[in-house]
């Protein structure tokens, strides 16, 4: 669940076809100062209002999985390298 308040911004660094996942899916690399830990891999992150799964953490960027259905139904079908993006971590629960 997300609260709708954008605390972080990022820039799309790369968009690649995913060979590891389902055909037609993409991996989106976003550069940002947002902080993630290894234990956050697999968590949901709101990226421009779309819930995406964090799949890898790099030094200054993060990789997210986009399914074929997500691409079809969201603004990510028009995403471009260099585009700014709003980021929001999910709320803590428990």
Predicted regions located by residue number:
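Conserved loop->alpha-helix
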Residues: 1-94
